[in-house]
C-alpha cells in the first residue's frame, strides 16, 4: 500500500551558487557523511560533484513531501540520506524525526519500503520517492 509520493526538481546551478556562497557550512548542515563521501569521489569533475549534491537535495525534498511534512514538524535535512542497497538501487535512510514520522504512518504489522529514483541532465536534477507499507513476513 502506498503511504506517500513526493517529487522534486531543482536547478543544479542554484545548488552550485549556494555551495559557492556558504561552502562547508551548507554541505555539513544538509548532507550526511555518506552523501558527502559519495560527492567527494566525484570532486575531479566539478559538474558531476555539484550534480551529486543537487540530486540528493532533490531526494530529501521529495522524501519530505512523501512523508507529508516537508522540512518541518521535526523532520530535518540530515534525518534523510540517500544510500545505495547492495545491488546499487538508491533508497532513503531515515533517522531522527523523519524515522519517527515514517513509523507513525505504518499500519500495524507492516514495514516500510522507500523507492527512490534520482537523475540529472544539466542544469536540472530530479528525484521521485514512493513510500510503501509492506506486510511483515
From Swiss-Prot:
Residues involved in Mg(2+) binding: 8, 61
EC numbers for this chain: 2.7.8.7
A GO molecular function held by the record: magnesium ion binding
Swiss-Prot/TrEMBL catalytic activity: apo-[ACP] + CoA = holo-[ACP] + adenosine 3',5'-bisphosphate + H(+)
One Pfam family linked to the record: ACPS
Subcellular location as annotated: Cytoplasm
SUPFAM superfamilies in UniProt: 4'-phosphopantetheinyl transferase
This protein's UniProt keywords: Cytoplasm, Fatty acid biosynthesis, Fatty acid metabolism, Lipid biosynthesis, Lipid metabolism, Magnesium, Metal-binding, Transferase
Gene Ontology CC: one annotated term: cytoplasm
Necessary cofactors: Mg(2+)
Record InterPro entries: 4-PPantetheinyl_Trfase_dom, 4-PPantetheinyl_Trfase_dom_sf, ACPS, Ppantetheine-prot_Trfase_dom
Family of this protein: Belongs to the P-Pant transferase superfamily. AcpS family.
NCBIfam families reported in the protein's UniProt record: acpS, pantethn_trn
Described purpose of this protein according to its UniProt entry: Transfers the 4'-phosphopantetheine moiety from coenzyme A to a Ser of acyl-carrier-protein.
UniProt cross-references to HAMAP family, sorted A to Z: AcpS
Protein's UniProt name: Holo-[acyl-carrier-protein] synthase
Species: Afipia carboxidovorans (strain ATCC 49405 / DSM 1227 / KCTC 32145 / OM5)
Underlying gene: acpS
Amino acid at each position: 500500500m502506498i503511504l506517500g509520493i513526493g517529487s522534486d526538481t531543482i536547478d543544479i546551478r542554484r545548488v552550485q551558487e549556494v555551495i559557492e556562497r556558504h561552502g562547508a557550512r551548507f554541505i555539513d548542515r544538509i548532507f550526511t557523511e555518506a552523501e558527502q563521501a559519495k560527492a567527494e569521489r566525484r570532486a575531479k569533475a566539478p559538474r558531476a560533484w555539484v550534480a551529486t549534491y543537487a540530486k540528493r537535495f532533490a531526494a530529501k525534498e521529495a522524501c519530505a513531501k512523501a512523508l507529508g511534512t516537508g522540512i518541518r514538524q521535526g523532520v530535518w535535512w540530515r534525518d534523510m540520506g540517500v544510500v545505495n542497497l547492495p545491488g546499487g538501487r538508491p533508497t532513503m535512510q531515515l533517522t531522527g524525526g523523519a524515522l519517527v514520522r515514517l513509523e507513525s504512518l505504518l499500519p500495524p504489522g507492516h514495514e516500510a519500503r522507500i523507492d527512490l529514483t534520482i537523475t540529472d541532465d544539466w542544469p536540472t536534477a530530479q528525484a521521485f520517492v514512493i513510500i510503501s507499507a509492506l506486510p511483515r513476513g
